[in-house]
Amino acid sequence: VFVTIKPFYGPYVPDSIKNNLKTILRKYSVAGIVTEIQDLKYLYVEVDVNAYYNPSLAPDSAALKTVVTNNINSFADSAEMNKYGAKFKYSKFQTIVDNSSSAITSNITKVTIRRDMKPLLNQAAEYELCFGNPFYIKNTNGYNIQSSGFTIFGQPDTLYLGDKPAADKKTGSLFFFRLESRNNPVVVSGNVGTIDYARAEMLLKPITFTGTSKK
């Protein structure tokens, strides 16, 4: 039996608490049933909002920005967006922005989705990331997905994850690259996994991570 728990504070339940819960549940479990407590897989939605407004109706742009930001934050903190199986509805989000003030005439919002992966350090493992929303291929030459930095066994440099679409533009391959400069990526390891753009799924072959960074 697999169990997930959404804590009030922080995204994950500490391992010590997981072990205590498993010990308690073991007293009530039926013979042959083993309880495994897994970390939740959060899907983060990041938005870049450009709202257009009539300045004669809202002379104070800073105040208008504050109202829009507060409404977005309230929506982000709502139970609707923080329950199991929640769905982000783009049209509803745009309506929330537009309805923030009668001065707003329209908005163009760019949406980026993100998952935070907790790798097993210093041990080889496969990884699967599922996003539930088709990936947009902006560049057929690759580098459509982005990751923060990480290190792997046998490579001293900080690496990043990149993608290369296949000819069908439905699937592709994953690779690791390092940055010699901001706009100068160098591929270090090719074909380290696969990506399905339509299904929004990525599968990494067995890899040994040795560290991660937030940049």
Name what the model sees in each region:
Residues 38, 62-155:
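An aromatic-glycine-centered, glycine-rich loop/turn in mixed alpha/beta architecture
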Residues 16, 143-145, 209-215:
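Extended Gly/Ser/Thr-rich low-complexity repeat segments
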Residues 1-80, 84:
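Carbohydrate-recognition loop of C-type lectin domains
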Residues 143-186:
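Structural flexibility/helix-modulation signal
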Residues 6, 169-174, 178, 182-215:
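Surface-exposed interaction regions enriched in Ser/Thr/Asp/Glu
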Residues 18-28, 95-97, 172-180:
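Short amphipathic alpha-helix segments
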Residues 1, 43-47, 107, 125, ...:
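Residues at beta-strand starts and edge strands
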